[in-house]
A protein has these predicted regions:
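Glycine-rich phosphate/pyrophosphate-binding loop
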Residues: 18-26, 154-198
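Acidic/His-rich active-site region of diverse nucleotide-sugar glycosyltransferases
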Residues: 1-52, 58, 67
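Short, hydrophobic alpha-helical packing/hinge segments within bilobed ligand-binding/sensory domains
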Residues: 60-61, 99
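Generic detector of well-ordered alpha-helical packing
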Residues: 57-60, 82
Length: 198
């Protein structure tokens, strides 16, 4: 599974860790390896075509949980995935655009209002990060893309919220309160961002 912060930032902090036999429920399946019944996939509408790369697995998992199904980790299963944490140009743009897309689409209104300050803080941090890496225009492009899809996102949102069986309170309890990525140490994240997000 994949650990995710409630602002939508993926937190792959179990990479290169020893296997555990008592892994808890997870809020998001990893798109690299997961299995689910076709009936479940079709019931939740499958993958969102607007999420070409990144967070498409998070979105599908979220909608599965909203319909009352659980996501389990099977520690005895083995899959080899040559993963390389690389925050390149394409990944940054697609990840940022899709992260905001699914937050706006899947959270209840009251949840969005409650976490709006945290989302604003993370957005500010991502803008600063983008500026120093030469990706500022890509970050702006992600906002423009979200704005251009506002009506479409709103339609999807109404459909999803009308069909949901599980409230955010249960789902959000599985999200991470901090941002943590294995092998990545950033003093600004560790000593500024995470204490506030908690």
């Amino acid at each position: 599974g994949v650990l995710v912060n409630y602002t939508g930032i993926a937190c792959p902090n179990l990479i290169d860790q020893y296997d555990q036999s008592d892994l808890p429920l997870t809020e998001s399946a990893c798109g690299g390896i997961f299995m689910l019944p076709r009936e479940v996939y079709e019931k939740v509408g499958g993958f969102d075509d607007d999420l070409f790369l990144y967070h498409e697995d998070h979105d599908l998992s979220w909608r599965i949980r909203m319909m009352g199904w659980k996501l389990m980790v099977l520690p005895d299963s083995v899959c080899y995935h040559h993963y390389n944490f690389n925050k390149g140009v394409l990944k940054f743009y697609q990840s940022e655009k899709n992260r905001l897309h699914i937050l706006l689409k899947n959270f209840e209104c009251k949840t969005l209002c409650l976490i709006a300050p945290a989302i604003a803080l993370v957005e500010f941090s991502q803008i600063v990060h983008a500026f120093f890496h030469g990706w500022f225009l890509l970050k702006l492009k992600s906002y423009m893309e979200i704005a251009s899809q506002a009506i479409k996102i709103s339609r999807k949102r109404r459909k999803i919220q009308a069909a949901r069986k599980v409230a955010d309170k249960e789902i959000v309890s599985l999200y991470q309160s901090t941002i943590s990525v294995a092998g990545l140490k950033n003093p600004l994240v560790d000593y500024f961002l995470n204490p506030i997000l908690k």
